[in-house]
Amino acid sequence: MATERLTRVHSLRERLDETLTANRNEILALLSRIEAKGKGILQHHQVIAEFEEIPEENRQKLTDGAFGEVLRSTQEAIVLPPWVALAVRPRPGVWEYLRVNVHALVVENLQPAEFLKFKEELVDGSANGNFVLELDFEPFTASFPRPTLNKSIGNGVQFLNRHLSAKLFHDKESLHPLLEFLRLHSYKGKTLMLNDRIQNPDSLQHVLRKAEEYLSTVDPETPYSEFEHRFQEIGLERGWGDSAERVLESIQLLLDLLEAPDPCTLETFLDRIPMVFNVVILSPHGYFAQDDVLGYPDTGGQVVYILDQVRALESEMLNRIKKQGLDIVPRILIITRLLPDAVGTTCGQRLEKVYGTEHCHILRVPFRDQKGIVRKWISRFEVWPYLETYTEDVAHELAKELQGKPDLIVGNYSDGNIVASLLAHKLGVTQCTIAHALEKTKYPESDIYWKKFEEKYHFSCQFTADLFAMNHTDFIITSTFQEIAGSKDTVGQYESHTAFTLPGLYRVVHGIDVFDPKFNIVSPGADQTIYFPYTETSRRLTSFYPEIEELLYSTVENEEHICVLKDRSKPIIFTMARLDRVKNITGLVEWYGKNAKLRELVNLVVVAGDRRKESKDLEEKAEMKKMYELIETYKLNGQFRWISSQMNRVRNGELYRVICDTKGAFVQPAVYEAFGLTVVEAMATGLPTFATLNGGPAEIIVHGKSGFHIDPYHGDRAADLLVEFFEKVKADPSHWDKISLGGLQRIEEKYTWQIYSQRLLTLTGVYGFWKHVSNLDRLESRRYLEMFYALKYRKLAESVPLAVEE
């Protein structure tokens, strides 16, 4: 039998060299086109557009070879004639950098730092020989296990359990960390799980077997209190369960683990340990309240997300505490900013109970400067100089409220995450990070040209805060895979922080690794009491019908709604979002305005922005101006309705269902959307949904089955897809029902708050455990981060102007 020869895998550069030899003229033609663009950056879609402009015969020759592969994987091309440097991404999380001399057709490999240095030459005056601070977090993770398969991205806890369960339980000596972990559990001075009668692994196993023997002789329903004293005498305390049956299961899980460890048993056992009683959730910016705030500046999906999150989390915590046989009252505190100028909201109230909960409160702490308390709202882009003092004030308030430390701190968005990092660092508590949106992805080239954005957005400070928090945290929750590592063709939000440069400030050669086991995908859901299917007629909120009728169809034009719908028989295309550039609402209006066929088939209704008051948000002002211009340019009155932001969530749920009654559709046209809560909400009511393929909605929707993907950069195609859908529905009404049902099924399978809250508590337990028993605490990197914070972040934060109080 012939033996197969193992051949060396050629590098990308070597394969490119071979292609250059074979197709010199064709490659030269393309590279010359790119070089002719002059000094600058070409994004992936621009590189592909240039490729499509060369003659078809040449295209065909290049498509199948190494050069075609490089082109398809190129995320950006840096043009500095005669050189073109390429950032090539063969698959998510894997990057290579090349540089081609267009005149000599010479290819060079570049290290990340070399590529970034080359890129910096685009910015005048940055290509000097001075020492540049380079950030590299890779050495701190070099000794730590790292998965390499794409399917492991976002499944960090499973990988961690597999790797470390094998490592931890290999001999008697290695069981000591587990024993110590079980002994450290207590609540307000009351010992849980094990007391000091158990001193070593041998005595633990002996006691567990003794307990197992006893429990197998009693009625499974026997409450723990009946054998509590007996167990205390042998070394076992409360926390194992509320009944003999539950305690026996927990003890058997631990015995199985000690005998033959496996990751599933480990996770199940850790799930049962009483670890989380007090949770702190940080969300400083915006108007955080429960009523009449949605649509205020910086106040949208994140507020809804957190309020839904805490309700589900409290329910799950109460359920677990009961099953653990404890009578502890949990606390969940949402920490946000107290606004003395609360403009008709409850944002000036220190403590506010969360509706539908027993033990969740919003705790508001004001921003302070040297003059005292800051009274007015401040944009999320300008909060940075206040956050260090704010952290100290929050720590003081928490000590008063909780009479102890929290067990978990969850940060939200950039400001919440850096405050969470500082608090977790100070208190030694497990930290979870939720980005919601990383602004670097939303504003292309905002890193290399950061100075252009600085006056308005202060991105240098925000990107530094993001980098600090994502490296400091114990675990990161994302709603989608795309948020971490994008897709085959698009770069993930976190992935975009792998290597980047802020010329004149610092160069990040290794900022984050998307394969890091700290990443976990935990998708949120829609509130099922509000967003339920339009077919559930007995639950429909008919009392809202007159108000919804007024919103949609009234002939009156005022600050609440302008433009009228003349033909009520037509289906409605509906969208609802903040009015900013990234949400791209004006983009959708323009697509509609330009497409005569779409206008003939359907009406368009937009809920965005607040025309009832003067906006303080510069971006919102610009988008409003654009909206008025579009109405005039395309003569939209008669087919279009613009409604000011609607803050009543319960009524909004019924509004979605009324759109379903018209056999309409929901469109989410964002340039980029981290998750897409409105997409989940619309689908949960049965409304067929068309949403951006950039970000989370690409995963929420299965194209053609539970909705449709649209490309915000090709509005004409998106409009044509809508035309195609509504023409199909006109010919066959069951097509609408099919997509509606597909959306409902997708939500039920994957996007519920119950699944979310169970997962969050499981992750807290697992990461808390590994942090204790291994080197997962990442002490070395924390020291590095302290220096980065003190020497870079603090100075950047101080450079942001303080708000002027009138």
Swiss-Prot record:
Protein name in the entry: Sucrose synthase
Cited function: Sucrose-cleaving enzyme that provides UDP-glucose and fructose for various metabolic pathways.
Molecular function as annotated in GO: sucrose synthase activity
Family listed: Belongs to the glycosyltransferase 1 family. Plant sucrose synthase subfamily.
EC number: 2.4.1.13
Pfam families: Glycos_transf_1, GT-B_Sucrose_synth, SUS_EPBD, SUS_N
Region annotated GT-B glycosyltransferase, chain positions: 275-752
Stored NCBIfam families: sucr_synth (TIGR02470)
Gene3D superfamilies for this protein: 1.20.120.1230, 3.10.450.330, Glycogen Phosphorylase B
Swiss-Prot/TrEMBL catalytic activity: an NDP-alpha-D-glucose + D-fructose = a ribonucleoside 5'-diphosphate + sucrose + H(+)
Swiss-Prot/TrEMBL GO biological process terms: sucrose metabolic process
Keywords for the protein's UniProt record, in alphabetical order: Glycosyltransferase, Transferase
UniProt KW Cytoplasm keyword: no
InterPro entries: Glyco_trans_1, Sucrose_synth_GT-B1, Sucrose_synthase_pln/cyn, SUS_EPBD, SUS_N
Enzyme class: transferase
